[in-house]
Amino acid sequence: MTDHSRLENYPLSPLQQGMLFHALSVPSSGVDMEQIIITIRERVDFSAFERAWKRVLERHPVLRSKFVWEGLDEPLQIVEKAVSFTPRYLEYHNLSPSELDERVEDYLKKDRVSDFRMTEAPLMRLAVFRSDQPEVKCVWTFHHILLDGRSFPLVLEEVFNLYDALRAGKDLTLPNARPYRDYIEWLRARDLS
């Protein structure tokens, strides 16, 4: 058994436990896979874009989390100190806007049923569709066990604030983010009272 005591770890919330159970019971269902389509209508500095995503992963432990359960009394989320994250660039040239949209739709269908390995972080991926069109489309896919509907817009806001700063050659200091661990500790304290 792997010793997880040296990495940050904590229990799952009840909702996360349900999602983990579902991911293990019904693989490739796509039920808890979130897909966000991002359209960028300007010339993109892909180096700055990648660095912005990597900075956000560094800032938010939950985005570096994996889940373990085998041989344990209860599942744990383990926060990796660092994770590898590189967008997948898909090149589509000589396509009309509608043909590019068809390629994105095809990708969405296949991507939705491409499971994450819950024991490997990060539980997210980014596909970047480059073409002759004056815009770039991206698909950010993540497992819902990481982020809820109120959290993911905040993550995207940080990505684009960092991207704008990096593209301008500036350093942006963001306010400290509250780690998900605090929520888990609050839940456990509430359950004990």
Q: Predicted segment positions?
A:
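Acyl-group handoff/entry surfaces in thioester-processing enzymes
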Residues: 3-81, 86, 95-192
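Helicase-core coupling region on the C-terminal RecA-like lobe
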Residues: 92
